Amino acid sequence: MKQLQVLLVAGTHGNEINGIWLFDEWKKSSFLINTHGIKTFKVIGNPEAKKAGKRYIHHDLNRSFKEESFIKINPLNCERTRASELVNLYGEAGENPCQIALDFHTTTASMGSCIVVYGRRDADLALASLIQNQLGLPVYLHESDQKQTGFLVESWPCGLVVEIGPIGQGLLNSRIISQTKLILETLMEQIHEVKNLNLFFPNKLIIHRHIKSIDFPRDEEGNIDGYVHSLRQSKDWQELKKNDELFCKLNGEIIRFEEDEPYIPVFINEAAYVEKNIAMSFTKRELWNFKKEWKQALIDLIHQK
């Protein structure tokens, strides 16, 4: 049986420094975080961007994990080269193969703490269920968006993203650091419980399923000519109903939510998403029954069956 190994990543975006700082302190004092004896690799995702104090150098690292990127490595593209390096080092067939990847991020949006799952892989949903059951975190299921692909955790058999906010880029914050530490330790504890078959899975999982993303209002030249309405700003996870305010223009014009069914907005006014033409994303809150296939997939993965 292969040894269970977990990849822990901070600084996938170089200006999200709270996880990086926590990892640096952890390396100085190994007792700071309890990994329950599980072998972990603590990695700074994008060290070049960290040095530069930027989100990325050439291309968003968290959109660079695509098969074609690994086949045709561009030495002039820092992030695609780094994605290939990480997979070669820690991927399933890498030098230090890890079964689970946990990627720690921060956001400028008022998201609080949440888990992001990409697609519907059974092991991901099982682990997300465990952490939601322990900490009550919302789970954002990101899928069916062809404009946003190539996420880091998708290159591992099981992987979750942790998002914590709000926090400005390049700033340290005690609450963000404490939340990161708490979630990391809880995840490691739950993985340990699965390893020892001493676990309790919930019957339900609350999912916020991605529907679509919307852009800011723009003029004929493509420039942003409106901003998030004051009644919508910082209202992540709060239900949007028809005719609710979305955006406002300086002339007083209000752009309203026009969908017939209610949605839950997330990542409202996230600073890093402006370049991606995303003002916010819409989700639908759903209550899913926990499936035994999820549980078995996670157990089999951790026990290398």
Curated annotation (Swiss-Prot):
The cysteines covalently paired via disulfide bonds are none
Enumerate the catalysed reactions. an N-acyl-L-aspartate + H2O = a carboxylate + L-aspartate
Q: Which residues are substrate-binding? A: R55, N62, R63, E163, Y273
Gene Ontology CC annotations of this record: cytosol
User: Does the record carry Metal-binding as a key word?
Assistant: yes
- Annotated keywords: Hydrolase, Metal-binding, Zinc
- GO MF term set: aspartoacylase activity; hydrolase activity, acting on ester bonds; zinc ion binding
Q: Name the coenzymes or cofactors required.
A: Zn(2+)
Annotated EC: 3.5.1.15
Gene3D superfamilies per the UniProt record, alphabetical: 2.20.25.160, Zn peptidases
On cofactor binding, the record's note says: Binds 1 zinc ion per subunit.
**Binding residues for Zn(2+):** H13, E16, H105
What the record says about family reads: Belongs to the AspA/AstE family. Aspartoacylase subfamily.
Which HAMAP family would you find in this protein's record? Aspartoacylase
Name of the protein described by the UniProt record: Probable aspartoacylase
